[in-house]
Amino acid sequence: MAEFDKEAYAERERSAASRKTLLKKQELVNSYKERLQKSNGFVIFFNFQGIDAYPLTLLRLDIKDLKGEIVVGKNTLFYRAFSDTVLSDHRDIFVGPTAALFAYEDPVAVTKKLVEFLKETFDKEWEGRIKGGLLDYKYITPEQVKELAELPSKEELIAKLLGVLMAPVTQLAMTLKAVPQKLVLVLKAIEEEKSKGGQ
């Protein structure tokens, strides 16, 4: 019977574990790429250091309700996933604790929610938390992220548009309603004139 080689066995185990780790990392990189594609090239990176687990979980739920997602990941994997975008020129984003915010419907709504949360959590120091990101696969600075958060959301824009579209219809309805009322008043005035003239 052959003697058991502990070192060879240990090496095979390390090699198998290493392959599993590499596969897992590649799966994460692919999932980040899929999220970016699903979000039509929208992602914002922010520093989550100092945010307790419970508030971060609540933020994640709020973002999920707005059809978005927050992912906490390793900078090397984020960089690998986004290295084929303009973010490859902005490696400074991938330094320190990093979370990614994806929006699958309304980027403005999820950005507003993130900025609101950061303001509540960090008061005056919130601005340094935003690292930048992508909008339609184009790089956006932290300042542009703040400007994005100040835009009206999709729902607000739809409400304003409906108001603009409904104004002429409402005016027409009021005009049409006023015509019979004015006619009645004119007829009443004629009737009063005749009754005065007849006496």
From Swiss-Prot:
Keyword Ribosomal protein listed: yes
UniProt keyword list: Ribonucleoprotein, Ribosomal protein, RNA-binding, rRNA-binding
Organism, as annotated: Aquifex aeolicus (strain VF5)
GO biological process: translation
Protein name, UniProt field: Large ribosomal subunit protein uL10
InterPro entries to which the protein is assigned, alphabetical: Ribosomal_uL10 (IPR001790), Ribosomal_uL10-like_sf (IPR043141), Ribosomal_uL10_bac (IPR022973), Ribosomal_uL10_bac_type (IPR047865), Ribosomal_uL10_CS_bac (IPR002363)
Assembly, per entry: Part of the ribosomal stalk of the 50S ribosomal subunit. The N-terminus interacts with L11 and the large rRNA to form the base of the stalk. The C-terminus forms an elongated spine to which L12 dimers bind in a sequential fashion forming a multimeric L10(L12)X complex.
One Pfam family recorded for the sequence: Ribosomal_L10
Similarity-based family: Belongs to the universal ribosomal protein uL10 family.
Its job: Forms part of the ribosomal stalk, playing a central role in the interaction of the ribosome with GTP-bound translation factors.
Molecular function terms, GO-annotated: large ribosomal subunit rRNA binding; structural constituent of ribosome
A single cellular component GO annotation: cytosolic large ribosomal subunit
Source organism phylogeny: Bacteria, Pseudomonadati, Aquificota, Aquificia, Aquificales
